[in-house]
A protein has these predicted regions:
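Short, contiguous, pocket-lining structural segments
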Residues: 255, 259, 267-271, 296-300, ...
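N-terminal auxiliary segments of SAM/dcSAM-dependent transferases
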Residues: 4-73, 80, 148-266
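Short coil/turn segments at secondary-structure boundaries
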Residues: 89, 232-238, 275-280
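A short secondary-structure junction signal
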Residues: 122-123, 184-185, 222-223, 275-279
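Conserved alpha-helix/loop element of class I SAM-dependent methyltransferases that forms part
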Residues: 269-293, 307
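Alpha-helical subdomain
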Residues: 1-152, 166-168, 287-506
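Preference for short coil/turn "hinge" residues that link or interrupt alpha-helices
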Residues: 93, 157, 278-281
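Conserved SAM-binding loop and adjacent beta-strand
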Residues: 98-100, 260-279
Length: 506
């Protein structure tokens, strides 16, 4: 029985902790296990108590108990975790490896060691990273594809995976795990003799190795393909596939037909990011008047909006996407949804939102729609840089009526720390406030750490494919406002990164 197994695993963890504690207390009644939040630099001076606590972590009995805890936690988490989240974490696990290698190659551990336990803001951290790149010492922050915002998102994935600490929003510090790959060299030494970083070390830092997809972001001054550009087509994806095309035009090239078909069906699979049919709770669809029109912008084959069309027959849903996608959309669904298409309750229109302003459309019932009731952008903005996203949003804003709503469906990534700016409970929280998913007083990270790491992995994947990223709620609010939209509501299920953000014209 599953509950019996879960309780057995829970008990095993407790017993193993007891075994570890006995070893520590046999040496000293007050001796504690090393904290993950406190770095342990091998080249530094330590108190006798710190040295003993660290050495006991390798004691045979302690190590065996620790291994049982890791095994039980892994078994427990895979048993209760939603299979989709587990798959995403494992399929994209290489992204975490790339980010660890980036952290090592960019000398972030050494920079943060000298910054101390208070940590360093990403603005200052990026400046020091660039100063340690021989060909980039005169480059200004933001002169290449790696910006402070990108750096913050990379390090937030690592903090969410417990490889760093985010002590305040966008301020990061080392922890016990990151300190393990410290070379022991000073930043000044690395500036003068970068080729000797691994000399006279235990080889741990050197073993981390090198990767290209994320490292290309830090190659400002080294790689002319990515220098001085923030265009989507300058993403590492373009280097990997040796193409100047953006991802979606590349997907439509002859020879990529199977990839294009797979992508369309894969977007239907992205329903798994949210609670089942959460799109129906993400907006007050029933409050819209009879005949209201929902435009699903860049909606692919309509994998999410078709749920709305089926549940709310008083609405008319129009999915807009590029011609190759739209032409295959209806046939992709088979006979099940034929009544929706035959009645005109759901239809498709070929449109590239970059090529022209949004123009009126004529429905099957003869009505001309000059502006819809709702524009929906689901998993769209995370595909584009902020500049390109602003172009999309500005065009929709120009087509909107005062009563038009914008609904954005995307992952909204909390910080890996508590945000004191949102801790004031004397006033109603802003819709853009960063939530804390952890219970009060819990040692869990506010974003639930490994329980939500899948979203932070996707964040870095978007960076590598599109020079884009997932956003915090504050970043989303600022982006929408810059294009003439004000956030009025954010809906998400407890502990889930997925959110539907509603905005109105301003």
């Amino acid at each position: 029985m599953t509950f019996t197994s879960l309780r057995a695993l829970h008990a095993l963890i407790g017993t193993a902790i007891d075994d570890m504690e006995r070893v520590y207390h046999a040496c000293s009644p007050d001796l504690d296990y090393p904290s993950i939040d406190k770095p342990y630099y091998k080249a530094a001076q330590h108190t006798p108590e710190e040295e003993l606590a660290e050495s006991l972590a390798s004691d045979e009995a302690v190590a065996a108990a620790a291994k049982r805890i890791v095994a039980a936690c892994g078994h427990l988490s895979h048993t209760v975790n939603k299979p989709w989240f587990g798959l995403v974490e494992d399929v994209h696990g290489g992204i975490t490896a790339e980010c660890i290698r980036f952290m090592e190659t960019a000398n972030i551990v050494e920079i943060l060691r000298e910054a101390g336990p208070e940590g360093l803001h990403v603005d200052s951290l990026l400046k020091q990273i660039l100063e340690l790149r021989p060909k980039a010492r005169n480059a200004a922050v933001g002169d290449g594809p790696l910006t402070p915002a990108h750096l913050g998102h990379i390090l937030r994935l690592l903090a969410t995976s417990h490889y760093l600490r985010e002590v305040k929003p966008n301020v990061f510090a080392n922890n016990r795990v990151s300190s393990y790959i410290d070379s022991g060299k000073s930043v000044a030494y690395l500036r003068e003799a970068p080729d000797k970083k691994y000399t006279d070390t235990d080889g741990v830092a050197a073993s981390v190795g090198i990767t290209y997809v994320v490292l290309s972001l830090v190659s400002v001054g080294d790689d002319q393909k990515t220098k001085k550009t923030k265009k989507t087509w300058a993403a590492p994806f373009n280097i990997a596939f040796d193409t100047p095309l953006e991802y979606f035009p590349w997907l439509e090239l002859p020879g990529n037909e199977a990839r294009l078909t797979r992508f369309g069906h894969g977007m239907t699979g992205t329903r798994q990011w949210e609670a089942k049919n959460f799109i129906l709770q993400g907006f007050d669809w029933a409050d819209l008047p009879e005949g209201s029109v929902l435009i699903d912008v860049g909606g692919g084959i309509g994998g999410t909006s078709i749920i709305v069309a089926e549940a709310h027959p008083h609405l008319r849903v129009v999915v807009e996407d590029r011609e190759p996608v739209v032409s295959a959309a209806i046939s992709a669904w088979g006979p099940r949804y034929a009544p929706l298409f035959e009645s005109g309750r759901m239809s498709y229109r070929a449109r590239d939102f970059f090529r022209a302003p949004w123009d009126p459309l004529t429905l099957r019932d003869g009505r001309t729609v000059t502006a819809p009731s709702v524009f929906m952008l689901r998993l769209i903005l995370h595909d584009w840089s902020d500049d390109d996203s602003r172009r999309i949003l500005t065009r929709l804003r120009a087509a909107a009526r005062p009563e038009t709503k914008l609904l954005v469906g995307d992952l909204l990534l909390p910080f890996a720390c508590r945000d004191d700016a949102d801790a004031d409970t004397s006033a109603s929280p802003s819709p853009a406030a960063e939530p804390s998913f952890a219970p009060d007083g819990s040692p869990l990270l506010p974003n639930l750490g490994k329980g939500n790491v899948h979203g932070y992995l996707l964040d870095i994947m978007m960076m590598g494919m599109f020079n884009a990223r997932e956003k915090t709620t504050a970043e989303m609010s600022a982006l929408l406002l810059s294009a003439g939209w004000k956030v009025t509501d954010v809906r998400r299920t407890p502990g889930n990164l997925w959110g539907y953000t509603t905005a109105v014209p301003v």
